[in-house]
């Protein structure tokens, strides 16, 4: 399982980081946590052997080995999870996160918790539910397949080159 509140703008979460770790570390899973450059993992105290807290690990290194992502619901975290067919527990705090979380619930790929009210028990229960209910995994796999079927970056580059070559402004019809 991978847990992150993002590695850049994650200092405004109060004790949410501690509450989530407290809930997840009681599950019989390996837990990888990233906290960003401004938080020293040692500040979070000793952890059980199955909990690994780092400042930063590339998502691309962690996600292929996960069954669930617990995150703030930022676009990078959500797209990363979905591209790997992983369901999520989302704890949105602001910006794009609440809208991302709402859409993930609509798609059946996530449960959402309130960042102010969520207790360690709530986090543990939500993670257990998503892990145990195969519907979340099936929905995430469906989205993964849709993402994989999209044209790649080569297609986007070709379109941009063509647009740049036309040397005309893009105008929308009135």
Q: Which role does the model predict for each range below?
A:
Residues 1-68:
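Donor-nucleotide binding loops and adjacent catalytic segments primarily
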Residues 8-12, 53, 91-95, 114-116:
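Short, contiguous acidic/charged loop-to-helix segments that flank catalytic cores in large enzymes
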Residues 13-16, 100, 152:
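Residues at alpha-helix caps and immediate loop-helix transition turns in enzyme cores, especially N-
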Residues 30-33, 89-90, 111-113:
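Short hydrophobic alpha-helical runs that function as membrane-insertion/retention elements
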Residues 55-103:
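A donor-sugar binding/catalytic signature common to diverse glycosyltransferases
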Residues 120-174:
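C-terminal amphipathic helix plus adjacent low-complexity
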